[in-house]
Amino acid sequence: MRLLGAGDIRGTAGRLGVRPTKKLGQNFVVEPGSVRQIAALAAVRPGDLVLEVGPGLGSLTLALLEAAVGAGDARLVAVEIDPVLAAELPKTIADRAPEFAGLVDVVTADALAVGEAEVGRPTVLAANLPYNVAVPVLLNLLAALPSLERGIVMVQAEVADRMCAGPGGRVYGAPSAKLAWYASARAAGTVPRSVFWPVPNVDSKLVAFARHDPPSTSASRAEVFAVVDAAFGQRRKTLRAALGGWAGSPAAAERLLRAAGVDPGARGESLPIADFARIAQARQDR
């Protein structure tokens, strides 16, 4: 399959009058080897429905389509917020891979608001996520699409580090804990700035994730995430102090923490998601 190169990307963008914007986090991948690497890491299997977010001008889309065809009985759905790019993508696919164009559905939508009604039941995510909303998009997709089993995403390097961080790590925070509710994440490689157009001012990394069951608790996800937000809202404070507002007072927070088996003198950055779930449940059980 003929993938897109730098000249193809710039030429199409010029013809369409498209100028990549920071508002939409647009940095297009222009190196075929890089998109093939991402597609390979997606490990598309027979019967998969692959979800791509932010396909842009289609460089990764074509590589994923190539992988889907190779896997057999796999399909692709691409979600693009920019209507001009969404309208152009089917034309690019028809030009480069006309015999497989029927395997791709393009949806014009905001990935922060999509669900099964728009994209069906995808099993794998592969995406160059917009840098400015990467974490919210990923968390929304995992919440809205329980069929998503695994994925590979390209994000800003420091965001990748936070996604993959574990308790006690320097960059472990609310995004790390919330992602851990849904899935395990690991670093899967680095991506040089030179493969993008325009060239970004930051480095990029690949993050692979695999869904797992959430912690066992009778508390809802929203209740657990409220504890996470409170704990990391005041990172340098002990949990007794940081959760005072959430619990009603520091003394009430201490009682709930002790009921959950968590040290009131600990800080949020030391707790795994299961501990946050126990704290939320302790409040529910009181």
Indicate residue ranges for each PLM-predicted region.
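Catalytic cores of RNA-modifying enzymes
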Residues: M1-V227, R258, V262, E269, ...
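Short helix-coil junctions and helix-kink-helix linkers
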Residues: G244-W246
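Acceptor-substrate binding/catalytic loop of class I
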Residues: A230-A231
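Primarily a LysM-type cell-wall glycan-binding module
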Residues: R235
